[in-house]
Every structure is written in C-alpha cells, then in structure tokens.
C-alpha cells in the first residue's frame, strides 16, 4: 500500500491489482479515522493506492507507507484533492473509488470552528451526488448513523443513482465494497 498525502501531485497509474481509493470525510474534529481506514484497507489489499487529504508528517504511525510526507507546494490543497477525487471517482477506465466516511465529531478533539463540523465533507458529497445525476461516479459511503443530516444525504444519493444507496456502518464493509466498486 502506498499513501499519497498533500500537496505534491504525482502521476498515478492505478490498476485492477492496485486501485486508487480516496479517503473523503471530516478531518478537523473527525479524529484520525483516515489512519484506521487505511489500516483496514492494508489488511485486505497490500497493493492499494490511497489518496488521503490529511496533512500527516513523517512521525505518523503510517509514515512507512507514504510516498512522501506532507509537503509544501505552490497549489492549494483543494487542487490536490480535486485531482485525486476526479481520478478515483470520475475518470473512466481508472480502477478507483471515493470513500466517504461520515463519522461523528470527536469528543476529545472537537472541530475548532467557527464553521460547522464536516462542512467541506458535505460540500464534496453534494458535488459528487450532483455528478452522479449526469455521469458514472464510483463512491461508497459509510460511517455512523448519527451523522447529522444523513437521511437527507442518503435520499439525495438514492435519487442521483436511481436506487437505494447503501450505507455501511463498519470500515471493513466500506473497504470491501470500495474495492469491489473500484474494480467494476
């Protein structure tokens, strides 16, 4: 498994054996769920490519899997995120999938504000829901059923995809289904 973190954009060539998974979900106030998800994926598929927008440095517990630690670049982090979100979830012929993890706000390290918890995540999932109304989108959604607004999110996804959109409550289920979607 190789983990790509911001901000350097490097060319990736995902394959069926090494699909690209993008970890989308709350960062500030969300805990380190991305590391937990990466470990679940690593335990299933050691050759997976993971794009993770967390600004992990060389001291992180998964640093041995990094292509390189968080690095400065001329581009905004959003440019990095959009690049890999498109590649994982939209580009045809690319084995990839976006994982949206909608967990609850951390009680020990809550979101500092002033904007609401998971604001960027809601924007991103809304954007890819709109894309799904017009094109093929590869994405899987999981998390905690107590995530505020989940019913509306799942309704919108079901409308966009034309059938009831599945929601997974464990990281193991999310990883399993993301790898299946990535290889379709």
Residues of each region from the PLM?
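Conserved catalytic or regulatory cores that recognize and/or transform ribose-phosphate-containing ligands
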Residues: 1-184
């Amino acid at each position: 498994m190789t983990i790509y973190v911001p901000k350097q954009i490097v060319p990736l060539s995902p394959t069926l054996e090494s699909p690209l998974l993008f970890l989308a979900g709350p960062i500030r106030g969300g805990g380190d769920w991305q590391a937990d998800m990466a470990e679940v994926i690593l335990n299933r598929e050691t050759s997976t490519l993971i794009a993770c927008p967390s600004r992990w440095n060389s001291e992180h517990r998964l640093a041995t899997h990094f292509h390189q630690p968080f690095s400065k670049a001329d581009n905004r982090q959003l440019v990095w995120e959009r690049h890999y979100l498109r590649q994982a979830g939209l580009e045809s012929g690319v084995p990839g999938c976006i994982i949206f993890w909608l967990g609850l706000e951390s009680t020990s390290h809550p979101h500092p504000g002033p904007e609401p918890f998971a604001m960027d995540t809601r924007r991103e999932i809304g954007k890819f829901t709109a894309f799904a109304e017009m094109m093929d989108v590869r994405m899987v959604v999981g998390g905690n059923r107590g995530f505020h607004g989940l019913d509306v999110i799942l309704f919108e996804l079901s409308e966009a995809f034309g059938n009831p959109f599945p929601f997974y409550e464990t990281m193991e289920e999310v990883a399993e289904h993301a790898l299946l979607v990535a290889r379709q």
